[in-house]
Amino acid sequence: MRENGFPAPKFSTTIPKGDDRARAVCDHCGFIDYQNPKIVVGSVALWKEKILLCRRAIEPRKGFWTLPAGYLELGESVEEGARRAAWEEARARINIDRLLAVYSVPRISQVQLMFRATLESENIDAGPESAEVDLFDWDGVPWADIAFPTVGWALRQWRESRGFTEFPPYSNPVEGL
């Protein structure tokens, strides 16, 4: 018994009726603790054709460059989450243009949504998870030091979508993960 008078939950792993995979199920009340993918939201944000990148100050891939992105919080829209991530990582205010891509990263149970965006100003500064932030023209992107495959995909797909106002969202390239 816990201090609040409720029994401490005890879970067993079983396949619930009508399901096709093992889940953690409460032995007392039958509650099913579904483990679902995490949603990551971010942006390819520009200031006058220069791309905002953040050098990671944390693991994984500390010291490598990434786009401003982060986990979606409860109660946020995906657009709100992308704006918050840009602020937290680069102290950048962004205007979302449109959805650029949706990536599936099953090996780490993530779904990533990347937006095309513009910076409201060139005033940027490293947030607590960034060692530094900078604006890069296309030829100056530090390709050898990009943190994750999805960052490279988003950058290339942003470039491919330039000049288009309507296009279906991109997804994982054929080579996948």
Tell where the protein language model's regions lie, with residue ranges.
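Short, low-complexity, intrinsically disordered N-terminal peptides in bacterial proteins
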Residues: 1-6, 173-177
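Acidic, metal-coordinating catalytic segment for phosphate/diphosphate chemistry
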Residues: 2-42
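Short connector loops at helix/strand junctions that flank enzyme active sites
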Residues: 21, 36-40, 46, 60-62, ...
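Well-ordered beta-strand scaffold positions
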Residues: 31, 49-50, 92
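Unchanged
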Residues: 72-157, 161-167, 175-177
